[in-house]
């Protein structure tokens, strides 16, 4: 099959994992600019949030190197994205919610014949299966 590591969903999941693991500092309750900027620039984030582009520009313009989660939660999707996860179970559930949000982008009528959409839908499905297995085995 098509390598999952070469799909947009993989890069998005990696950016989300980086955001939650190395990009969030529990001691200060803040995210790092680098991790926030990377995920705000991702095409999926920009498709799922009308505020992503503007927020990324604002953080850059105002030199917000360590934004608080409350500064980043501009809509429902960004609220999910920028809610810190404190343990592995929460992280797995978080990834599943993000994958489900992304899957909405590929449910449009008339796109089922497009080979890239088929590949991306399959990559989302495989990512969901892998995350779901992690959640079940982590219980």
Regions found by a protein language model. Name each.
Residues 1-139:
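Polyanion-engaging groove/track-forming segments
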